UniProtKB/Swiss-Prot annotation:
Matches recorded under HAMAP family: Ribosomal_uS10
Alphabetized SUPFAM superfamilies for the sequence: Ribosomal protein S10
Source superkingdom: Bacteria
Protein name: Small ribosomal subunit protein uS10
NCBIfam families linked: PRK00596.1 (NF001861), rpsJ_bact (TIGR01049)
GO MF term set: structural constituent of ribosome; tRNA binding
InterPro entries: Ribosomal_uS10, Ribosomal_uS10_dom, Ribosomal_uS10_dom_sf
Organism: Anaplasma phagocytophilum (strain HZ)
Assembly notes: Part of the 30S ribosomal subunit.
Gene3D superfamilies, sorted: Ribosomal protein S10 domain (3.30.70.600)
Family to which this protein belongs: Belongs to the universal ribosomal protein uS10 family.
Length: 105
């Protein structure tokens, strides 16, 4: 049985949804017998957009928008194929972007 190191990167705009998804991944990994590091919190990234309310005049009247992107990392240092299959069968919400990186094996 070959052991691999698995990194799971999660991104979302809603931090509550992101934390619930990270908790589900950690629960499934621990139930499968893996050692879990994380979730590791990354700094929140904020993008701000400022646009004029009017199309032609009144430069002083503007609308401000911002998007906050939250990010978490979960590391599984010694994972096997059974743990990877358990993680792949997990259903996550649509608002969470998941990237899985497998190192070794």
């Amino acid at each position: 049985m070959v052991t691999q190191k698995i990194y799971i990167e999660l991104k979302a705009f809603d931090h509550g949804l992101l934390d619930r998804s990270a908790r589900n991944i950690v629960l499934v990994a621990k139930r499968s017998g893996a050692k879990v590091n994380g979730p590791i919190f990354f700094p929140r990234r904020t993008a701000k957009f400022i646009v004029n309310r009017s199309t032609h005049v009144d430069k002083k009247s503007r609308e401000q928008f911002e998007i906050r992107t939250h990010k978490r990392l979960i590391s599984l240092p010694k994972a096997n194929s059974a743990i990877l299959q358990a993680l792949m069968s997990l259903q996550l919400p649509a608002g969470v972007d998941v990237k899985v990186k497998v190192v070794g094996g």
